[in-house]
Curated annotation (Swiss-Prot):
One of its GO terms (molecular function) is phosphatidylinositol binding. It is found in: Cytoplasm. Transmembrane segments: none annotated. Residues 123-156, 381-417 are annotated as: Disordered. Pfam families: DUF3818, PXB. Keywords: Cytoplasm. PANTHER family: FUNGAL PROTEIN (PTHR47185:SF2), PX DOMAIN-CONTAINING PROTEIN YPR097W (PTHR47185). This is Uncharacterized protein C663.15c.
Amino acid sequence: MDSLTSILLLLELQHEFSGLKVPGRLAKFGPPFRPSEEFADAEDSPVMKMIAQSYIFTPTLPGVNKAPPEFWSDKLQPLLETIGKHNLSDSYDHGRVSKRKMVGFAVVVVLHVLSKGLLGKATPLSEDRKPTSNNEEEDDADEAKSSNADSSTDSVQKSLANVNMDDANGPERLHYPSVKRLREAYSLLVYGDGLQQALDRISVSEDVDSWDEPLRSVIENIRYTIAVILHFSFVTVDAIPESPHLVSNRKGPEGVVERLYNRIPWFLTRQVLRVGNAGLLMSGLTRLFLMKPLSWFGESRNLLQTMLAGIFNADLEHSESTMVETDAEFEDDAKWETMRKALQWFTQLSRTEQDDVRSQSINKELNITIAILEAYEAQQTETTETEGVDKEDSDKASSVQGNEDEVPDTASETEHSEIEDFHFDPYSEKGVHIAMRYFDAALTHRDRECLIHDLCDNDQLNDVVREFMNAFYNIIYEAHQAADFSQAIYDFQYFLWDVIQLSKAGAPLVKFINLVERYQSCFVRFIHRLVVNAPDLCGEWCDWYRHCLKQFSVEVKTPDAVDVAHKALNTLDEETKHQVLEEIGDYVKELDEESKKAIENKDSTSEWLLHLYNFFGSAIITPTTAHGVPQPQLPNCGMKLNRTKEKLLTPFRNLLMEQLNELQAKNQETPSEMTSTE
């Protein structure tokens, strides 16, 4: 797949995933979701729809294939659309990329990797080509093998936070998985018996580090990828300084994860999972997390709702205290009162109205609070003029006398107001910081209230979880008979704790790789017991794995994304085409330069992570002053693909959707033709 197609797929997936917050987009995915008459004109999402139909909504995925259609259309879809209708806040307004948007960026780059495999296909190795390796690759493999030779296969019984991660057994430098070996492994998995080889080996031994190439490179890559994701999410993002006007409430993902960690009843969960009977196990889990206790004071919450509400309430209390402190600081200040009303007014606007104000902020190069203030004052002026015309004739006589009597009071009020207005100036640097701090708290407060209402104050989420557990009952039953769930939860608890401790310490990537290597034995042991003791369950999952791997094969027909990209490019005039190609060429060069810098800094060189860095760093946020150009989250960081998004993305999406519809129509005609022939 060429660079043009790859970049267009990346931009298209960003557009599609960010559009899921708009009601009606999910209904466009087709079955099992129900079409929406209310949002019939919603945009299509061709790439995400194709990924969902290829990997999730298949008859081979265990658990999902047992879920009734009503689960998706009557349970999950209404919950997601309800959250979408509440119009949660945008990162641009906060002045920094939110955790929610950061997770969205991570999902986009993962979907990009899947879409490249689905549309670009894996290239099979030629029969006369023998896998070769240079001395450097062999040395790296030997070093990786020796560094892992001492890793224990016993269960982790204590926290690794107190273990010296710089010991002699830890790698002194990063061992990047060989790209050539990975390509050989992918070809073996897609076109050969790579999956069966892996199953045979893991059924015999838990020592995956003794595997031969190229499958050993797959294990290294999995380990490496998990460590990179953890390091980026918990350290890299947290190390980026926030805007000076924002007051952090335990900033960083580890704050949310630690709050969740502290609210999970680990001991009770392990005790329930020790029950031998699978039916009692499912009943115990349902009672533990979903059963509501009796209450004399209205309807109570179950444990799941209480855990989520506790996480949201921490942000709710912090934002509320910030707003109260700001209001107290500028009590009886006329200009602050106007600004406060304007910010609260904006939080209650519809999505379209908020987008209009946001566009004014970008086009006029204004801070979002100034744009909101101007829009609010214009709306108030229009309302006042309308009301004044209606009352002008009836109040004319009385207003003259009233004005004469009230002249001294008006003058004194004006003088008093001017004195107070001196304390808060919305256009000053300090005023913008104060307004942004209050605005960030107001948006957070509204978001958390909406999430608490959707997830904790009604039973929609409970119904989704209950149906999900019913669909996976057989899987949980067989897995419970084959492996020790209680020990698995114990290992995961301490792994999560160590991730939190490393995150607080701002540990480098190497320590996260060491951490994943040390806990690798826990995960491999669990998989080993499932393969050995639950062959039927293992066979079901392997059928799905083979189905997924087959999608990367050239035998499976999918839209020709490269052809679509070049057809879309040819719809542009020569000048625009040259500009688009120049943008994409510059971006590819920047990726190469960033990869070289990453090697020098002992950081990850994965293409998907570089895309993730660029997504995060180039996200546009409101300027920090009253007048200024909107800036990216990180200085001098920008994807610089605006022309490509503006001119080429829509033709690419439309042509891709046409090919996808034609391919689906052919697939539907083929079974009917076979039936008529018979």
